[in-house]
Amino acid sequence: MIQVYGIPNCDTVKKARKWLEEHGVDFQFVDFKKSPPQVETISKWLEQIPLETLLNKRGTTWRKLDEQAQAAAATVDGAVKLMAEQPSIIKRPVLEKEGRFFVGFSEENYQEIFSK
């Protein structure tokens, strides 16, 4: 089963979910707010996704963090712990398909992912 991780009111997540529905793709949505990803899950994502991609330093959640919290994210372990505690700083959506992980949404990427 394809899983989409994110926050329901995020515009990018909405676009991804709409695209999947319009293309008849069955998927399960995992809401970060109701079911935050565990350290193990985030670590698994990082096996395929670079930390700089997964950790969203452009969002308001990141900017609201104090310097100490931001500094803790300089290490992989610190970043994983921070993402588990503050899932809003994870770039969204995270798509899981057949053991592969993808971050963000663009129609072109989704067309390529689902043409295989």
Predicted stretch roles:
Residues 32-116:
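Thiol/selenol-based redox catalytic cores and closely related redox-interacting motifs
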